[in-house]
């Protein structure tokens, strides 16, 4: 009978209640029953085989035993003599007796074998085929009915609400019929499995009992053993009979219960308030929506349970047609806490739908579809569902929103503090999302004032302190605010600001709108953008550029009130607004917008607009194009070449470095901010405004004493010049039109007109990101020798001549001051000190001029290359005088070890600078240009702007251009418009650059192709020595 070591664990009964619900647990239990039945079938099959083999062997044995019995019975003892003794008679009869015993035994064997062959083997075969085989047939029918019902159910649920009512009724009736057949077959199958399992206990054992009894009867020698086992056998028979009686009684009750469940399919739940199958709508991400496949959704079948007391909702993806059984601990079911339940509006594309939200996933709405109207009502009732709130079409429904309160500010500060302490160098920060459960937990704890102090420092919350989790929690808080940080009120205004024609207009409009935000919104936005600014500085390591941050935070900070196709298409403008805020953080958040700022007309004054990479400067026309235009009259009258910008002497524009006496950081003009020479058309009004060429300059306070240039204070703090060619777009400003916001000073007769082109406070933080420099333009005049000159005429009437200041060398920037410029200081934004001129004085304001660019196309590295030196920084001087006599002036340099002394070759200049002035006034020029007093050009020069270089670097560049070994870096994208012109992208290196025969054009090689390149589209790289 075997020991008790391999006792199999009992199977759980198959309840009809579970059969109706058809839960995954029921399916698993059913599968265990099926496996156990297969195992039993296999064992019975082996037993039948062994019994057959035994019967065959027993028949052979019986034949041999009968032969032996015959031999024993026929054995004849012959007696010697005429009489035998009793012993001999007993001996002679013993063999016959033996034969008779063996015969009797073999007769019983024959009976036993006949009965075993007829009743044992046939009964076992019949039991296995009819009972276990019948279960397998039922399983096939059950699987077929299951598949047919599920497919019918899904077809019914997928029917559109636009179908006719009779079609829906027919489909409903068909589904009901299939459902009834499926349930009938399911109940029958469950009943049959349990019946077979129970039949094994008595029918199978009863057959084997008969087999054993036959063998015991067969063996006469086993009579005592039979007597010993009589009680056992009798007891076994009694138990078998009792089991049979129990089976008959249970079968009657089960039949009654089956009838009961066919009439009423459910009973009051004990563990779960409601459970069953639901279909979940899974929509594609809004960022993945395309115009070809908008709002594509899929419906996935889940087995769901709900406990009303704990409001615990579990969902497990499961489909009976393609299920895969796993261990209960390996199932990936999701447990959530129900927050709200709302019936879906009847206008929805599917029937029987309702929306659920959960505390673990705020702001996420789950849309489920029930299996029928009745099932739909049961779910709504169990979850205390509410009727839908009918909003306007396209309204965004926010299930749970955060508020911009003190707890929110504290949470954001803590998140930013932790992230910045870690260095902001995690790759993909704010792009890679953290674990959803951790994010929700961190938000819940961080916004709880009792827990917020501990969550960022307590070791038990260490698993929540991953950088991606913190960054995702910060984003989720901002995204789920009851109103976006930049408010619904100004959303369309921000979008319109991002659609402005020029970058400066966009920046100024965004600047104004930011200061219209409520104070809490402004403070939070200031904190977030300041943090994102720091993130963007670590772009090389975290790969989060300003553009990437705009993509991530655009929909978060600028959320539309209504969800529509138009709002989706405007997402790119959300990103542009965020890019502007990050790129111009210091300008926008540290300086209030001025009410009297007037933006220049981009169509009338393109020369002073900020040239972005998307709006590169106008290229210098080639000679062939100029000739063609001139022949058709497109360039104006040939008799008045002075009014034609193409025939004007193009001024050389240089990058000049300026330094204050002690505290001012280094400033330089940005190469990207230099206007195009061909845009500086010299109009007739500008030509008539003065007798000579005007150069409006911002100079230190000086007095003209007997023709000598004399300073009134010892430090030159700001020096800014604007070329004569800009007078067509920048009018002369008299003293009656002083505009302090722009730092403009007008002077009467006898004074030099001062105008600040970019009156900007320099912030150490912003300058580290985007170095903003003063732009200085100069009109080189005819050299009387080899020295270069810069001159300007006075604005006084009758002044037709100019004084010339001869400068031959440049004092390069000091390394320490250059480092101070790029590293900045902790003192925050700094302002220019006031400049006095005679009786007129003014103070620089804090705001940024709208003409000031917000970024440069040249990298910090290129600026450093152009400024690499160990000497002091300088400022350029432009001086005027009513006298035509010589002006003697001496220029002092702080360091003369590496540079040649300043020389005056044709004019004797003597120093008259104060003893406290530590500035070296310098300028660097390329080939000079001769201008007459009337301002007409006598010869044409090279057009494009050029970065300032030290004299020896400039000479080296000249030599490299002459020999064809110069190297340049492209600043803008350019598409070759005619044969012989190169096409290139920004930040490409062009080699073998040399002068060309076309004015304003160079010749170079890129990717093995040689052609012309516009000189104002490139900057020279530092020569290799």
Swiss-Prot record:
Residues 854-866 have a biased composition (Low complexity). Keywords: Coiled coil, Cytoplasm, Cytoplasmic vesicle, GTPase activation, SH3 domain. SMART domains: RhoGAP, SH3. It comes from the Eukaryota. One of its GO terms (cellular component) is cytoplasmic vesicle. Residues 271-388 form the PH domain. Interacts with Egfr (when ubiquitinated). This is Rho GTPase-activating protein Graf. It comes from Drosophila melanogaster.
